């Protein structure tokens, strides 16, 4: 299959995803830079105090709410993970993860890209209070990685973009498993049973193919609360909810009705302004088209811009700000070195070595249209951990280990920046080299 055929095989949904995530990556970067500037300016005290401001409502002596930081990390990030869960479900059912042949190479790459960074970090920080941060360099920020690829444009094969997206989706799934297994404390089984009950109700709704999103979202709020109270991070509830959202398209006459409405619109007279009849027809077309979409597609379409242009940039602005002064101890255990080496060295080596060995052992096969040099380049870009790595660092280090958290954030920013620059320069040079050979 040549590059032209691969280009044609890339679905419209995937193209839109690349575009939105790429622009989202640039916006994320600007918010991270702004956070660092503000955190090291005369506004730093106001900046840090802002995130500890309680937000909610008071009933007598009882306060219902969280600090702004918790609203972002626990509530808004749950919406982000809901979108991630929807993307994973779609890819598992219809996309690049829908068959073993398609999924094996990027999934194996994702596994290698998580194990190697985690081992590097753990080896450097074993038997220290910071060893629990091994999950930090395991993550990949798809928005940033695709932002870099967008800047490279046609210098990057489309097949490599597909591979990187699929790898990142598998990486997100791995990150969810890591959070559930290693960053869960003080389990409360009564709340877990409550969560299980909600999941069973959601499963029944899915089985009955209830297409309205309202009952799913209302039960999702209840599920979030039960999981939050159980000791498991609440974002896991969002992923579970995503897998319960129906994906079936209704089998009815709405597509025929759409064609008839289209013919009616074409037959109406056109002028400078739409007539009342044309407006009514267009409104009907919009309603029928929306009804043809599955609940999963509707929810994903709704969440994508909110996540890309509001939730993740806000998360970056709230979490990337680190005050770099003489009081910060960069030598806390080996956190700085562990995170940077994990992202910059562990990611590309893990992805390259495990896929190379797997192909030699005939476990999987490299996608057509990309070379091993391209795989190494994708591995470098996968070292951009940023938002996902920061999210895990917030779970790994408590307030008692604040120094390690601050150092981890600096390391994430440095490691992600180094990986992005080296990855971009490497792929640019690779394209130049290929052009000279022609």
Curated annotation (Swiss-Prot):
<dbReference type="InterPro" id="IPR004670">
    <property type="entry name" value="NhaA"/>
</dbReference>
<comment type="similarity">
    <text>Belongs to the NhaA Na(+)/H(+) (TC 2.A.33) antiporter family.</text>
</comment>
<feature type="transmembrane region" description="Helical">
    <location>
        <begin position="337"/>
        <end position="357"/>
    </location>
</feature>
<keyword id="KW-0472">Membrane</keyword>
<keyword id="KW-1003">Cell membrane</keyword>
<feature type="transmembrane region" description="Helical">
    <location>
        <begin position="302"/>
        <end position="322"/>
    </location>
</feature>
<keyword id="KW-0406">Ion transport</keyword>
<dbReference type="Pfam" id="PF06965">
    <property type="entry name" value="Na_H_antiport_1"/>
</dbReference>
<feature type="transmembrane region" description="Helical">
    <location>
        <begin position="372"/>
        <end position="392"/>
    </location>
</feature>
<keyword id="KW-0050">Antiport</keyword>
<dbReference type="GO" id="GO:0005886">
    <property type="term" value="C:plasma membrane"/>
</dbReference>
<feature type="transmembrane region" description="Helical">
    <location>
        <begin position="104"/>
        <end position="124"/>
    </location>
</feature>
<dbReference type="GO" id="GO:0006885">
    <property type="term" value="P:regulation of pH"/>
</dbReference>
<keyword id="KW-0997">Cell inner membrane</keyword>
<keyword id="KW-0739">Sodium transport</keyword>
<feature type="transmembrane region" description="Helical">
    <location>
        <begin position="62"/>
        <end position="82"/>
    </location>
</feature>
<protein>
    <recommendedName>
        <fullName>Na(+)/H(+) antiporter NhaA</fullName>
    </recommendedName>
</protein>
<feature type="transmembrane region" description="Helical">
    <location>
        <begin position="221"/>
        <end position="241"/>
    </location>
</feature>
<keyword id="KW-1133">Transmembrane helix</keyword>
<comment type="function">
    <text>Na(+)/H(+) antiporter that extrudes sodium in exchange for external protons.</text>
</comment>
<feature type="transmembrane region" description="Helical">
    <location>
        <begin position="23"/>
        <end position="43"/>
    </location>
</feature>
<keyword id="KW-0812">Transmembrane</keyword>
<feature type="transmembrane region" description="Helical">
    <location>
        <begin position="185"/>
        <end position="205"/>
    </location>
</feature>
<feature type="transmembrane region" description="Helical">
    <location>
        <begin position="133"/>
        <end position="153"/>
    </location>
</feature>
<feature type="transmembrane region" description="Helical">
    <location>
        <begin position="410"/>
        <end position="430"/>
    </location>
</feature>
<keyword id="KW-0813">Transport</keyword>
<feature type="transmembrane region" description="Helical">
    <location>
        <begin position="162"/>
        <end position="182"/>
    </location>
</feature>
<keyword id="KW-0915">Sodium</keyword>
<dbReference type="InterPro" id="IPR023171">
    <property type="entry name" value="Na/H_antiporter_dom_sf"/>
</dbReference>
<dbReference type="GO" id="GO:0015385">
    <property type="term" value="F:sodium:proton antiporter activity"/>
</dbReference>
């Amino acid at each position: 299959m040549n590059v032209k055929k691969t280009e044609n095989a890339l679905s419209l949904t995937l193209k839109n995803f690349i575009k939105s995530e790429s622009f989202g990556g640039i916006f994320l970067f600007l918010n991270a830079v702004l956070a660092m500037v503000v955190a090291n300016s005369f506004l730093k005290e106001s900046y840090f105090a802002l995130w500890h401001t309680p937000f909610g409502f008071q009933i007598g002596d009882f306060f219902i709410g969280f600090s702004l930081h918790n609203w972002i990390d626990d509530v808004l990030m749950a919406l982000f993970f809901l979108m991630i869960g929807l993307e994973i479900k779609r890819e598992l059912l219809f996309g690049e993860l829908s068959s073993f042949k398609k999924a094996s190479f990027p999934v194996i790459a994702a596994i290698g890209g998580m194990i190697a960074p985690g081992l590097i970090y753990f080896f450097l920080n074993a038997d220290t209070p910071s060893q629990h941060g091994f999950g930090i360099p395991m993550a990949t920020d798809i928005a940033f990685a695709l932002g870099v690829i967008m800047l490279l444009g046609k210098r990057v094969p489309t097949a490599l973009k597909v591979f990187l997206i699929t790898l990142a989706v598998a990486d997100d799934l791995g990150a969810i498993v890591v959070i559930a297994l290693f960053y869960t404390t003080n389990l409360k089984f009564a709340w877990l049973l409550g969560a299980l009950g909600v999941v069973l109700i959601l499963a029944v709704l899915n089985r009955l193919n209830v297409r309205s999103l309202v009952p799913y979202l209302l039960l999702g709020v209840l599920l979030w609360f039960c999981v939050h109270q159980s000791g498991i991070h609440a974002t896991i509830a969002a992923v579970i909810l995503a897998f319960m959202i129906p994906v079936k398209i209704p089998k009815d006459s709405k597509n025929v009705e759409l064609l008839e409405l289209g013919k009616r619109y074409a037959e109406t007279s056109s002028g400078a302004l739409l007539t009342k009849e044309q407006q009514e027809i267009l409104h009907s077309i919009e309603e029928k088209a929306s009804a043809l979409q599955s609940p999963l597609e509707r929810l994903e379409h709704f969440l994508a811009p909110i996540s890309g242009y509001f939730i993740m940039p806000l998360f970056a602005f709230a979490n990337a700000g680190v005050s770099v002064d003489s009081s910060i101890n960069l030598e806390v255990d080996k956190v700085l070195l562990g995170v940077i080496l994990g992202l910059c060295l562990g990611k590309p080596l893990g992805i390259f070595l495990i896929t190379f060995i797997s192909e030699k052992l005939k476990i999987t096969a490299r996608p057509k249209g990309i070379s091993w040099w391209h795989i190494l380049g994708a591995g470098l870009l996968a070292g951009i951990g940023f938002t996902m790595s920061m999210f895990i660092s917030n779970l790994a280090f408590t307030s008692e280990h604040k120094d390690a958290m601050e150092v981890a954030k600096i390391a994430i920013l440095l490691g992600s920046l180094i990986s992005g620059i080296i990855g971009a320069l490497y792929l640019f040079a690779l394209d130049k080299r290929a052009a000279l050979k022609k």
